[in-house]
Amino acid sequence: MHYSVLLQESINDLNINPQGIYIDATFGRGGHSKAILNRLTTGRLIAFDKDLDAISYARENFQFSNFEIVHASFASIYDYCLQHSLLGKIDGIIMDLGVSSPQLDNAARGFSFTHNGPLDMRMDVSKGITASQALEELSVDDLSYIFKVYGEERFAKKIALRIKDYIQQNGSIRKTLELAELILATIGKKEKKNPATRCFQALRIYVNNELKDLEALLENILAVIKSGGRIAAISFHSLEDRIVKQKFSALINPKQELNRITKMLPQDSSQIKLKWITKKSKANEDELNQNVRSRSAILRVVEKL
């Protein structure tokens, strides 16, 4: 079953205008979209998703005149708004980052290190390289870098060397459990978390360009949102959250150069573009009991001035 994490908190913090225009940057199974639509009267919602399964689900279950689903990465939101004359007209954006429960639970998608399936990991199966192909094509140094930076894996080089050696001997790694067991054999189980967790996260981020897409969205988000509009971001790991926090913070407290003569910071409020609505919120105990995956979720909400 799919749970939308921090659902009520994020929707409440968006302060929905019933006549407004909203964007769900990560449709998934439509939990946040449904909650927004329930609060709209003459307003409308545009949702984005790279996953064809999510697109099919939306077309079958969200047949509303004020709803549109777009098969695209949220990195293309600016271009979409430009093409449809919506720049500066969006009342709110919600983004629920990372992989969804249906993607994790379906072994055939290749995201799970506990259920065997093809080592794919693409959110959009219509294009791009699979995780299996990435392991074959990347050098030891590149693979090590991905594990270290995207997965924060301290044994990155050791795992990368073992993987490339295994591929040289066996031709490829085609199954998720094949990779998970290889990682376990390389570094052992030293903590409660599955030893494959970080490498699977890193590979998924690389295959789907997740952090680059997030940076592209945030780079242009001010041009999309209207004054008084709000942005809600839910992240599930420190890399995503760091990007969100740093971007929001830079627009709330912009770094300014000291005046060389007065040695004082210029008081230029025009450089301040956002204000915090929710600096940091986490799932409460009731939600944690319902959905263990919500334990790492962090919600941050800002408003455009």
Curated annotation (Swiss-Prot):
The species this protein was found in: Francisella tularensis subsp. tularensis (strain SCHU S4 / Schu 4)
Gene symbol of the encoding locus: rsmH
Enzyme class: transferase
Protein name, per record: Ribosomal RNA small subunit methyltransferase H
Compartments (UniProt record): Cytoplasm
Catalytic function, reaction form: cytidine(1402) in 16S rRNA + S-adenosyl-L-methionine = N(4)-methylcytidine(1402) in 16S rRNA + S-adenosyl-L-homocysteine + H(+)
List of residues binding S-adenosyl-L-methionine: 30-32, 49, 74, 96, 103
GO terms for cellular component: cytoplasm
Listed EC numbers: 2.1.1.199
Similarity comment: Belongs to the methyltransferase superfamily. RsmH family.
Keyword terms of this UniProt record: Cytoplasm, Methyltransferase, rRNA processing, S-adenosyl-L-methionine, Transferase
GO biological process, one term: rRNA base methylation
